[in-house]
From Swiss-Prot:
It comes from the Eukaryota. Belongs to the universal ribosomal protein uS15 family. GO terms for molecular function: small ribosomal subunit rRNA binding; structural constituent of ribosome. The keyword Ribonucleoprotein applies. Pfam families: Ribosomal_S13_N, Ribosomal_S15. PANTHER family: RIBOSOMAL PROTEIN S15P/S13E (PTHR11885), SMALL RIBOSOMAL SUBUNIT PROTEIN US15 (PTHR11885:SF6). HAMAP family: Ribosomal_uS15_A. Keywords: Ribonucleoprotein, Ribosomal protein. This is Small ribosomal subunit protein uS15z. GO terms for biological process: translation. One of its GO terms (cellular component) is cytosolic small ribosomal subunit.
Length: 151
């Protein structure tokens, strides 16, 4: 599948191992992994950042193979999941940064165009999340209040 607003195909990706059991060299218990996830979430880290930290610093390749459930499901079970999905959050953050740039550089036409593309992605993703009930049906992206969402 290609990119939305460019010509790239984006075909390179890592392969998830077929074996669903944890590797033999992972000695960490499921309860300890969940505790690490809770600590990181309370510090304010996003689920993908938590996964990277667990992989790089603690040697846990896949949380699902160790605990039986994914990081976001564990966070939801403990009430620590972010209210806005992570990919939407970072798109909103990007739009806020572009708007801030445009306040200082009003004649930057390319940034104006890129802002339109980013906001198109935000609206499309928000529509999907409303349909799948990950966002409330009354949720709406507004550029004036976007900076409060990512602050």
């Amino acid at each position: 599948m290609g990119r939305m607003h460019s010509r790239g195909k984006g075909i390179s990706s890592s392969a998830i191992p077929y074996k669903r059991t944890p590797p033999s060299w992972v000695k960490t218990a499921a309860a300890d992994v969940e505790e690490m996830i809770m600590k990181a979430a309370k510090k304010g880290q996003m689920p993908s950042q938590i996964g990277v930290v667990l992989r790089d610093q603690h040697g846990i390749p896949l949380v699902k193979s160790v605990t039986g459930s994914k990081i976001l499901r564990i966070l939801k079970a403990h009430g620590l999941a972010p209210e806005i999905p992570e990919d939407l959050y970072f798109l909103i953050k990007k739009a806020v940064a572009i708007r801030k740039h445009l306040e200082r550089n009003r004649k930057d036409k390319d940034s104006k165009f890129r802002l339109i593309l980013v906001e198109s992605r935000i609206h499309r993703l928000a529509r999907y999340y409303k349909r799948t009930k990950k966002l409330p049906p009354t949720w709406k992206y507004e550029s004036t209040t976007a900076s409060t969402l990512v602050a």
